[in-house]
């Protein structure tokens, strides 16, 4: 007999909702445990089977910790601003807010149908003005502290769409939607000074319990390198430019210099003879992204400006070139080229027949550049020194002569924070006609996104908000001065930078969150989500958290103590699930056919949580069969509790396996090894089926262990066992170390290395007694007839080997 999952799951979901079973109190003196999911973007497609994998993992932890006596914070919300809703609005003419609300309602329904123990009273939505009031407030604080500023930045401008595109929306120089040409165009943009926190973002990674691979990705993204800044004067001009290099020791090997095409000097120093070639080159590279420009595999391109730099030590004239492999956004937008000792410079010099000068011995520069350490040559006062000595000496010389200085550089750029979009948080700034700008006063927050039935690009590169005259145009009541509101909106990252803080105090209209509550709940103990957010979301959230720490708002330096990335669930054909491939599995269908408990159990049993594994209908059927076996063990055909579950069985055969199961399952849940925990639950059920009678205490313990994974059947079996309250707060089972060990052990008896018999003997039987038992065994006596025993080797607890001939 199998159980009716539809009936049982509906019954318990209704019970939890009605009784607010999972409401988290703030005034509790139990120890706290904050377990967080990366909240989803509520897309039109709804939940797919990949979402519940991470959500089930956090739910198992939340449910176990409640039973272990913790006050658990386990919330859910919606990261609901973002491009797809805006694109939908552009395509259909519908309001993105309505579309988003409909999607949220569908996501919430789906998530509730999976039986997760969220405290729905704490639900948040990044598009709710009561929420983004505080996103705007954080922006104003950043602005006050000089960490939000405006700058000219080259952006991806698509003339056909009349809008600026994010890097992710540009593929090979064309827009992802419609395939229109995209060019790089400088525009005034809001920037956040994340670089001010670069060192702390790097150093504090050491204190976190995160996967090493994610820490390494963040380290590389921040990209700290030590070196020197060197000043070069331009021959015949009253201009200088600065280069950053990690190898100032090779300065004597510099034979030319290169400026990024966007460098402000390009216009000033290009000679009339070279101007046509330079203009043609600038036009040609307009459509290339930074990624394409710095691709090591591609052929180097460039053009000579006609101007020369003066070598800061020797006074030699070095030609100044322009090349797209130098980015304005990295270092200073200018490099000194040392082709004998740098791969990119070498390729470039070879292509354009520029001179090379060897200054570090040890390689053969006819064949390839030498980038290793070695003795310096052709380098005046650096000759004979190794790399580090030469670096130190050159920096000292540059500083003494006012030609340069020691410098730390980062690959990390300031965060381009504005988007030319409608569907995002308005940036609370007013630009006045006299060229000044002021923040919207705090008491006027939230600055609400105006409703409009016409979301279309402005065509000027501004966001669609620029079209809403009555919202954009303002007059200062004190002075009568006219102004325009900022029409750019914040990126989707903004709302997700601090949402974990708002869950702690979601209805507070006086402050971001009550400091006492923040002190109680932070940091997040476990954060689970996909590895695709390894860098940006986690880096941005850490940046905002550190900023709020500096303001004295949060009590911890870091937001997320332990991070775990679940793997991806692939289609049955081992490909990524996608609509276009037709291999998407909808959880609604599985809940209907197999039940939410089966889906949860299957996703946790598929393999290690971090692995990417293909969906298998056979595996899903197997999970359901296991739950049916569990049900039949507890419940008779007529729905009563199995009479063989008794308080005191005549023969307690399950004691050892029960204690082993409690130990293994508890340890495995704690360390997120859910697949091996479930294997152990299966072992217990197999043993229980062999027992004539089962001790009720063990069967109750088993149900408690199963309930975090399969909460509906857990509650139902708990009720069948005679309880009237929810299982959610019952104490977690404990095990007795002394009961884990077997008192009888199986011994193998060999003759001349071949197994001839097996004995069951007490675990602590000494060596001599073991030999006697082996030689007295009937099977062994038979085998030894007519032979002489030469030697007996006994290993207690393992084997006896008899040598005879």
Swiss-Prot record:
Record-listed ATP binding positions: 579
Family annotation (InterPro entries): aa-tRNA-synth_I_CS (IPR001412), aa-tRNA-synth_Ia (IPR002300), Leu-tRNA-ligase (IPR002302), Leu_tRNA-synth_edit (IPR025709), M/V/L/I-tRNA-synth_anticd-bd (IPR013155), Methionyl/Leucyl_tRNA_Synth (IPR015413), Rossmann-like_a/b/a_fold (IPR014729), tRNAsynth_Ia_anticodon-bd (IPR009080)
Motif ('HIGH' region) on chain: 40-51
EC category: ligase
Ranges spanned by the short sequence motif 'KMSKS' region, renumbered to the chain: 576-580
UniProt EC number: 6.1.1.4
Catalytic activity: tRNA(Leu) + L-leucine + ATP = L-leucyl-tRNA(Leu) + AMP + diphosphate
Primary localization: cytoplasm
Keyword Hydrolase applies: no
Compartment annotation: Cytoplasm
GO MF annotations in UniProt: aminoacyl-tRNA deacylase activity; ATP binding; leucine-tRNA ligase activity
Gene Ontology CC entries for this record: cytosol
GO biological process: leucyl-tRNA aminoacylation
Keywords, comma-separated and alphabetical: Aminoacyl-tRNA synthetase, ATP-binding, Cytoplasm, Ligase, Nucleotide-binding, Protein biosynthesis
Protein family (similarity comment): Belongs to the class-I aminoacyl-tRNA synthetase family.
Protein name, per record: Leucine--tRNA ligase
Species: Geobacillus kaustophilus (strain HTA426)
């Amino acid at each position: 007999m199998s159980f009716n999952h539809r009936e049982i799951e509906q019954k318990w979901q209704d019970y939890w909702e009605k009784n607010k079973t999972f409401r988290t109190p703030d005034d509790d003196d139990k120890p706290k445990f904050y377990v967080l999911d990366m909240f989803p973007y509520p897309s039109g497609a709804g939940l797919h089977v990949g979402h519940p994998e991470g959500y089930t993992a956090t739910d198992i932890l939340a449910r176990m910790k409640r039973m272990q006596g913790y006050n658990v914070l386990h919330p859910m919300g919606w990261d609901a601003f973002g491009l797809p809703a805006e694109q939908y609005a552009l395509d259909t003419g519908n309001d993105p807010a309505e579309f988003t609300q409909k999607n949220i309602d569908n996501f919430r329904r789906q998530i509730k149908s999976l039986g997760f123990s969220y405290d729905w009273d704490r639900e948040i939505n990044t598009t709710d003005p009561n929420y983004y009031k505080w996103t705007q407030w954080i922006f104003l604080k950043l602005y006050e502290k000089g960490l939000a500023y405006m700058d000219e930045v080259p952006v991806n401008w698509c003339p056909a769409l009349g809008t600026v595109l994010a890097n992710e929306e540009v593929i090979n120089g064309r827009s992802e939607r419609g395939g229109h040409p995209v060019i790089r165009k400088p525009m005034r943009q809001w920037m956040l000074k994340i670089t001010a926190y670069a060192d702390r973002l790097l150093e504090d990674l050491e204190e976190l319990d995160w996967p090493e691979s994610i820490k390494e990705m963040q380290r590389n993204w921040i990209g700290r390198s030590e070196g020197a800044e060197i000043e070069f004067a331009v021959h015949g001009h009253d201009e200088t430019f600065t280069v950053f290099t990690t190898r100032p020791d090779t300065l004597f090997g510099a034979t030319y210099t290169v400026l990024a095409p966007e460098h402000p000097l390009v216009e000033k120093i290009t000679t009339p003879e070279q101007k046509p070639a330079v203009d043609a080159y600038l036009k040609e590279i307009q459509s290339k992204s930074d990624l394409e420009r710095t691709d090591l595999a591609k052929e180097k391109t460039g053009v000579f400006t006609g101007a020369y730099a003066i070598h800061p030590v020797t006074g030699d004239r070095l030609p100044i070139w322009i090349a797209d492999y130098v980015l304005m956004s990295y270092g200073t937008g200018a490099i000194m080229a040392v082709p004998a000792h740098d791969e990119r410079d070498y390729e470039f010099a070879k292509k354009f027949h520029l001179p090379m000068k060897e200054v570090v011995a040890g390689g053969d520069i006819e064949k390839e550049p030498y980038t290793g350490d070695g003795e310096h040559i052709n380098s005046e006062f650096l000759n004979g020194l190794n790399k580090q000595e030469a670096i130190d000496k050159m920096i000292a010389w540059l500083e003494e002569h006012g030609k340069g200085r020691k410098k730390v550089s980062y690959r990390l750029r300031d965060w381009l924070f504005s988007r030319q979009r409608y569907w995002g948080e308005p940036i609370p700034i007013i630009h006045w006609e006299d060229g000044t700008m002021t923040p919207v006063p705090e008491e006027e927050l939230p600055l609400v996104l105006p409703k409009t039935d016409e979301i279309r690009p402005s065509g000027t590169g501004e966001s669609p908000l620029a079209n809403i005259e009555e919202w954009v145009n303002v007059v200062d009541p004190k002075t009568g001065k006219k102004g325009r509101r900022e029409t750019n909106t914040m990126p989707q990252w903004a709302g997700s930078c601090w949402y974990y803080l708002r869950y702690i105090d979601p209805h507070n209209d006086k402050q971001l969150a009550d400091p006492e509550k923040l002190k109680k709940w932070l940091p997040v103990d476990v954060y689970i989500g996909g590895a695709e957010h390894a860098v940006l979301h986690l880096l941005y959230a850490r940046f905002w958290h550190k900023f709020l720490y500096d303001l004295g708002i949060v009590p911890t330096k870091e937001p997320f103590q332990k991070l775990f990335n679940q793997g991806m669930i692939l289609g049955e054909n081992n490909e990524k699930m996608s609509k276009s491939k037709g291999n998407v599995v909808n959880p609604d269908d599985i809940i209907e056919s197999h039940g939410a408990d089966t889906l949860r159990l299957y996703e946790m049993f598929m393999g290690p949580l971090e692995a990417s594994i293909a969906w298998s209908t056979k595996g899903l059927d197997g999970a359901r069969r296991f739950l049916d076996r569990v049900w039949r063990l507890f419940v008779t055909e007529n729905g009563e509790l199995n009479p063989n579950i008794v308080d005191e069985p005549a023969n307690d055969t399950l004691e050892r396996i029960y204690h082993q199961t409690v130990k293994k399952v508890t340890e495995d849940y704690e360390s997120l090894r859910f697949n091996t925990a479930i294997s152990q639950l299966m072992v217990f059920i197999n043993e229980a089926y062999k027992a004539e009678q089962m001790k009720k205490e063990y069967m109750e313990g088993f149900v408690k262990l199963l309930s975090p994974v399969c909460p509906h059947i857990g509650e139902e079996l708990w009720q069948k066992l005679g309880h009237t309250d929810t299982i959610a707060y019952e104490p977690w089972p404990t095990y007795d170390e002394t009961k884990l060990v077997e008192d009888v052990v199986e011994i193998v008896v060999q003759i001349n290395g071949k197994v001839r018999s097996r004995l069951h003997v007490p675990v602590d039987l000494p060596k001599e007694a073991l030999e006697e038992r082996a030689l007295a065994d009937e099977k062994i006596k038979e085998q030894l007839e007519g032979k002489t025993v030469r030697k007996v080797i006994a290993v207690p607890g393992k084997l006896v080997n008899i040598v005879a001939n």
